[in-house]
C-alpha cells in the first residue's frame, strides 16, 4: 500500500512539474511572437537608415547622369518661335533663273529652209553652232576685214586678229626692232584675241618700258607685241600668220632710231590702234 501511494504521489508531482513547465513555456512563446514584428520593423528601419546613409555618403566626384535627347529632338530644337523682328522680315527673293547656255547644235535653232546651208557652213569651217554664229557676226561688224590666225613656231601661242586682207607693214629700225627684225602691222586691241598660251608668254621692256615685247618661252618667237607708238593696240608679225588670208602687203620704213621726230612726222600711225 505504501509503495502504491508513493508511486501515485510521484506521478502527481511529475504532472504538476510538466504542467508548470508547459505553462511557463506558453507565455515565453507568446512573448517571442509578440517581439517578432517589432524585430522585423527594427531590421527594416535599420536597412532604410543604412540606405540613406549610403546615399548621403555618395562621393561627390560622381556626377548625376544627364538625360540625352534623341538626334531628331536636337535637330528640331526646343521648338521656340522665332524672334518678332525676324518674323516681320519678308521672305528671301527666289534665285534668278539659270541663263540659257549657248546652243551647240543647229537642231536648237529655228533655221527654216536655211538649215542645210547652216550645217554645211559649220562642217566646212569646223565650228560649233556658237562659233559659226560668232564668225558671221564678226564678219558683219568688221565689214571689209578678214579673220587672220597665227602663232609662234612651237604652237604654244595662238591668236586671231581681224584686219584687212591688204596689210600695211611697218619696218622699224630702232635698236631692238633691228635686232629682232620686228616688221608688223597695227590693229586695235578689240580686234585681237589670244586663243591660247598666256602662260607661255614672257615680256621684255627697256628704256621707257611702254613697248611690251612679248615672246614665247618655249621657242622664243615674237608673233605679236604692244608697240610704243600704239599702246592701245597690237603689232602683229605678218610672217607668223597662217597662209590663205593675206592678199597683199605694203611695207613702210619707220625711223625708230629717232623715234620722237618720226612720230611727229607720221600723221596716221597713232590712229591705227583706234576703232
Swiss-Prot record:
Zn(2+) 2 binds at residues 172, 174, 177. Pfam families: GFA. The modification Omega-N-methylarginine is found at residue 43. InterPro entries: CENP-V-like, CENP-V/GFA, Mss4-like_sf. The keyword Phosphoprotein applies. Residues 1-109 are annotated as: Disordered. Its cofactor is Zn(2+). GO terms for molecular function: carbon-sulfur lyase activity; metal ion binding. Zn(2+) 1 binds at residues 152, 154, 216, 219. Residues 79-100 have a biased composition (Pro residues). Belongs to the Gfa family. Required for distribution of pericentromeric heterochromatin in interphase nuclei and for centromere formation and organization, chromosome alignment and cytokinesis. This is Centromere protein V. The gene is CENPV.
